[in-house]
Amino acid sequence: MAFGQRNTSRGGRGGGGSSFRGRGGSRGGPRGRGGLRGGRGRGRGRPVFDSARLAQQKEEGEESNSESEESSQDEAMESEEESSDDDDAEPAPAVKSYAALMQSFTADSAPQAKRRKLNVDKEEKQDEEADLMDQDANDADHVEEAEEGPETATDGLLEEEDEEDNSDPFEAHFANPDDNILSRRLKHLENGQWAIQKSILAKIGRAITSVPGDDEAKQTKSSIINSPEELKLKQKLAGVMKKQCPTFDTLEKSISPLIFGYQDLLFCERNTSNAESLRRLTCLHAVNHVFKTRDRVIKNNSRLAREDNSDDLELRDQGFTRPKVLMLLPTRESCVRMVDMITSLCEPDQQENRKRFNDSYVDKEEKYSTDKPEDFRELFAGNDDDMFRLGLKFTRKTVKYFSQFYNSDIIFASPLGLRMAIGNEDAKKVDHDFLSSIEMVIVDQADALLMQNWEHVEFIFDHLNLQPKEAHGCDFSRVRSWYLDNNAKYFRQTIALAGFNTPELNTMFYNQSKNWAGKVKVSSNYPGAIQELGLKVKQTFSRLDSQSFASDPDSRFEYFTSAIIPTLTRRSKDSAGTLLFIPSYLDFVRVRNYFSTSATTRTLSFGSISEYTTPKEVARARSHFYSGRHTILLYTERAHHFRRYQIRGVKKVIMYGLPDNPIFYKEIVGGYLSRSVREGDLEPGDGSVRVVFSKWDVMKLERIAGTERVGKMIKEKGDTFDFL
């Protein structure tokens, strides 16, 4: 049974029930891990990774001991002119009426015809229950708690009487939206009509605002908010913010109107410097939203209790289920940071189950020294397990950890952990009703989630705001009409924070952001990583001709074998110290097999390091490469992401494709070659870099070559570009 599913005998579970090993990247490389526990769990054994390209691995002779996994899916990508800017027509949503919803509950509850059950069925059921109990025993996030009604256990959260303010974005967006504006924008959403405006945010970057309509985006201007005092906060939160953060910095002034105005936001400039500010803003907004939602329910409960003719009152103030905020995070440590920020803002008198939370999530051991990059230490410090889910429940004076999902206000989870909680679609028991009333999704460090399994993120978004299969004690007379009309997805706010934009993030923002308040994408103008290497080296960028995104892997391989390999084989002795960087694991397998079996490369000795290579094999490959026994070393992007190896003996770098993260380009080209110069293995100015790219790499190329250069490099007739 999935975590949070109704169960009168055992309460909610956390995690179990699903047996899939979900992995795979939509861009041709595995993006994460699967398995029942699946987590990288540094310090708990060697890293475990899975592959996403089963079919191609079999064709290319992948090792017999590799685990079987799901095939990656081809991803439709926008052209270079529109990949980072515009939104096109979107499909019209289906509307399910209130009557149809109630009919579905009636149908589900109707008596079913009796069937004879064979003994084998009973044995299978007993085996399944035994498996679930075993999973629960090993599950640190397992919860046994009876499910409460969605809005009945209010627990006296209301502390102060805040008057309803029509200028409050909470009122304007959720509680009392303008019917004329709302109906008009919903119609535009059904027709896929967006008005788009481009602007500049001072000292931040470019902003692309999209609002449902024809020309409304041009009329909408986000004002600057200078301090928390200008926000519509609950009194307690306002008092805390006045002490902790009396004024906003430049970033907070610019994006707080977007966040607190309930617009969707794709912010592509997250880094270690602004991470704390972004965390504070998003947590403040989430807690403020939860408090206002719960207080409205409590106030209306009191009103109904006082009124003699309460049946005549129509107070629609809630959703189908209680959870209102979902936070998707990469590791348990990132969850700890979010939780600590929330508790510092709401200052609860008591924290129930905090010790259990500390035992399961907090790891204070210093695992990495300062020789590791700052972004690496931020992501992998502490407990870096990526298999978790946690419910958080607020009462007037208490925060409760490990609350059952249906009793929670905020759900924290990794994509893998939440998908395991929902269950596999092929399994008998699948539960995603607890996601039916999510009104805010916060995806932090989205670029790190790309290095896990992005398909899990897509799966979760596909199951948000669906009408529930069970009533879960819901009082439908209190449910907001736009929930009953299946329009909840148009009210949900999505906030995605990433270090850079990618086709996956763009696609998610295009397909899943249907907010009637509009959406904003913020990115920067890039000077180019080629200018930030710290040494002088010739960098040659070669553009290959690729007719389609789907055929790009084949075109790239053909270009590599016909244009790059001959330069290596003609002077095999001069090829010593060549690092071949390959972003995609699928391409890595294909190239490795080519080196192993092709007669063309018989004069080239090589080693390889991927995300699946054991530590012992990594040490051997690095040693042979540095000693010269192997002239070429194949190296994947995800291996670098998870380990950041300091590879010695690099004299030349060939990039089969560009990395998503521009920091990787600086570390591999600038860092590795600079080290070789310092250690006397390479004369200054003798190193070289060869980069292969296609028009489908426009986002990566912009970050590495620079915003001003990318257009010419994609469109010019010449296909070779040299930089020093």
Curated annotation (Swiss-Prot):
UniProt keyword annotations, A-Z: Nucleus, Ribonucleoprotein, Ribosome biogenesis, rRNA processing
Localization (cell): Nucleus, Nucleolus
Pfam families recorded: Utp25_C, UTP25_NTPase-like
GO-annotated cellular components: nucleolus; small-subunit processome
Gly residues biased stretches: 11-38
GO biological-process terms attached to the record: maturation of SSU-rRNA from tricistronic rRNA transcript (SSU-rRNA, 5.8S rRNA, LSU-rRNA)
Superkingdom of origin organism: Eukaryota
GO MF: rRNA binding; U3 snoRNA binding
Ranges for region Disordered: 1-176
Subunit record text: Component of the ribosomal small subunit (SSU) processome composed of at least 40 protein subunits and snoRNA U3.
Known function: DEAD-box RNA helicase-like protein required for pre-18S rRNA processing, specifically at sites A0, A1, and A2.
PANTHER family reported for this sequence: ORF PROTEIN-RELATED (PTHR12933), U3 SMALL NUCLEOLAR RNA-ASSOCIATED PROTEIN 25 HOMOLOG (PTHR12933:SF0)
Protein name in the entry: U3 small nucleolar RNA-associated protein 25
Gene, per the UniProt record: utp25
